[in-house]
């Protein structure tokens, strides 16, 4: 879904939401593969922490994870204006986090195939 929304400046908040969902599901799939109970949380930093605690090191960027987390919270639970603190996410920002999520998906997919 996020890929279809990448080029529309009016839909960047929706794209950010779908990107977060994608990263969240990837992390949860990896946690499930470790035979752990998958927590009912949406916090990417906490999910990544669980993965790291089990000695799995991903080529991830915690700064981008934090940004995706922040955008998700603000798009899911917007303030009075319905915007994230910095305003509506730019297309460039959405393309950056989409590219990151796609790379992360491929990395986790390879780990799950082993």
Model-assigned labels for residue ranges:
Residues 1-114:
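Terminal alpha-helical segments
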């Amino acid at each position: 879904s996020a890929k279809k929304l990448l080029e529309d400046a009016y839909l960047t908040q929706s794209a950010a939401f779908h990107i977060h969902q994608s990263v969240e599901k990837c992390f949860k799939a990896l946690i499930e593969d470790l035979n752990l109970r998958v927590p009912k949380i949406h916090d990417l930093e906490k999910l990544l922490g669980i993965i790291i605690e089990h000695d799995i090191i991903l080529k991830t960027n915690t700064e981008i994870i934090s940004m995706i987390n922040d955008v998700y919270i603000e798009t899911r639970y917007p303030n009075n204006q319905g915007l994230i603190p910095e305003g509506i996410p730019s297309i460039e920002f959405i393309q950056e986090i989409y590219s990151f999520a796609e790379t992360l998906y491929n990395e986790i997919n390879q780990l799950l195939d082993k």
